[in-house]
Amino acid sequence: MAKAHIELTINGHPVEALVEPRTLLIHFIREQQNLTGAHIGCDTSHCGACTVDLDGMSVKSCTMFAVQANGASITTIEGMAAPDGTLSALQEGFRMMHGLQCGYCTPGMIMRSHRLLQENPSPTEAEIRFGIGGNLCRCTGYQNIVKAIQYAAAKINGVPFEEAAE
């Protein structure tokens, strides 16, 4: 099969590559770009472990071909921290609020949460739960994930984080 030439930006870096037209974006990111933070959980768009930010949208990268991302700007979990390694507000929130256990869903959950906070900087708990509804976590029960997102929203908005009474 003839390979297709693609040009895109990943985590702020220009990328040119030859890919087979049937290569899924998640496989291109992990195998050809060696960015293994996004995980393959189901390969059927159900779990969200492969979520990346593509041109300002959350995308499950197992649902699109790499050639469809030609010309796009993609951010993966590796692109979330500052160049000096300082964690983003969301990464810090997940760490501080214990928003992970096994960690498998965490990269996709953070990427989806990042887009959620871009769209709604001060979401309610219900809006957070709805916003992350397409990303599955089999370990945490979501409560600490919700707290992590609330923590990040407070930090981004420059207000103190106050945990809701349980």
UniProtKB/Swiss-Prot annotation:
Q: Which InterPro entries match?
A: 2Fe-2S-bd, 2Fe-2S-bd_dom_sf, 2Fe-2S_ferredoxin-like_sf, 2Fe-2S_ferredoxin-type, Beta-grasp_dom_sf, Diverse_Oxidoreductases
Cofactor detail note: Binds 2 [2Fe-2S] clusters.
User: In its keyword annotation, does this UniProt entry include Iron-sulfur?
Assistant: yes
2Fe-2S ferredoxin-type domain residues: 4-80
Q: Which reaction does it catalyse?
A: CO + a quinone + H2O = a quinol + CO2
Q: What domain of life is recorded for the organism?
A: Bacteria
For the protein in the UniProt heading, the enzyme class is: oxidoreductase
Q: Recite the UniProt keywords alphabetically.
A: 2Fe-2S, Iron, Iron-sulfur, Metal-binding, Oxidoreductase, Plasmid
Q: Where does [2Fe-2S] cluster 2 bind?
A: C102, C105, C137, C139
Pfam families listed in its UniProt record: Fer2, Fer2_2
One term of GO molecular function = 2 iron, 2 sulfur cluster binding
Reported cofactor(s)? [2Fe-2S] cluster
Q: Does the keyword Magnesium apply?
A: no
User: Which positions are annotated as binding [2Fe-2S] cluster 1?
Assistant: C42, C47, C50, C62
Complex formation: Dimer of heterotrimers. Each heterotrimer consists of a large, a medium and a small subunit.
Q: Describe the function of this protein.
A: Catalyzes the oxidation of carbon monoxide to carbon dioxide.
Q: What is this protein called?
A: Carbon monoxide dehydrogenase small chain
Encoding gene per record: coxS
